[in-house]
Structure formats: C-alpha cells, structure tokens
C-alpha cells in the first residue's frame, strides 16, 4: 500500500517530473492518471507501487554500500554527479534513465549528509 503523499515523496526523492514517471515508470505517458494518484483521487496501481518500492530498495542498497566503504576507509569519499543521462551512460554504459535517477538520488543524499563530495 502507498498513499498519495508517499508517491509524491518518492517522485521527488528521485527528482523526476510527472511526465518522466509516466514515460519510465508507468510507461504509458498518461500524466492525468499519475496526477490523480498524487491527488489521492484514485488508488495507486499495485504494479507502480511495486516498481517504486524496488527503486527505493535499490537506492538504499547503494547508500549502504557507499557508507560501508566510508566506514572502512576505502576510497576518497568523492562521488561523480552526472548532469545528464548521456554523461552517466558514458561511464555506466548499461545504465538506463531509472538507474541514473537512482544514482543521482544517492549522490545528493550522501552529499547532503556530508558523507561524499561531488565531482
């Protein structure tokens, strides 16, 4: 189960517009439905809840892995921040839009807590 506020929060954590969510998460380009979910007018599709929860899990795994490296003093506590998808894919050639958004969300979170510097 997920409510409208949780849906909005996750969209914002991943820095995605409603339009991007309808392209890359629902894959139906139906902004009106997403807006109705965020307004609490209709129940959120279980498939969409599952996709968002999986994105959240992947994000947390990345955060945990980086924090473990920091705690073990591996690396220099600097993380790349990619301004666009093409720059992300130049390094992570198998990465897609969703992977980029997860990566960026992790980078921003760790930077906000002074755990990583961005480069």
Regions found by a protein language model. Give the residues of each.
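A short, Lys/Arg-rich alpha-helix, primarily the initiator
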Residues: 1-13
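Residue-level signal for the short linker/turn that defines the boundary of a DNA-recognition helix
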Residues: 5, 15-17, 29
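DNA major-groove recognition helix of helix-turn-helix/homeodomain DNA-binding modules
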Residues: 20, 44-62
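Residues within the helices of the helix-turn-helix
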Residues: 8, 19-20
């Amino acid at each position: 189960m997920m409510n409208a506020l949780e849906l909005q929060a996750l969209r914002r954590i991943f820095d995605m517009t409603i339009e991007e969510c309808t392209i890359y998460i629902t894959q139906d380009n139906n902004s009106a439905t997403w807006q109705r979910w965020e307004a609490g007018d209709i129940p959120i599709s279980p498939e969409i809840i599952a996709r968002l929860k999986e994105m959240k899990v992947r994000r947390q795994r990345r955060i945990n892995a980086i924090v473990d490296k920091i705690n073990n003093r591996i690396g220099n506590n600097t993380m790349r921040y990619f301004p666009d998808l093409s720059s992300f894919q130049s390094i992570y050639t198998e990465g897609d839009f969703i992977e980029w958004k997860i990566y960026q969300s992790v980078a921003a979170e760790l930077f906000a807590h002074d755990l990583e510097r961005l480069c």
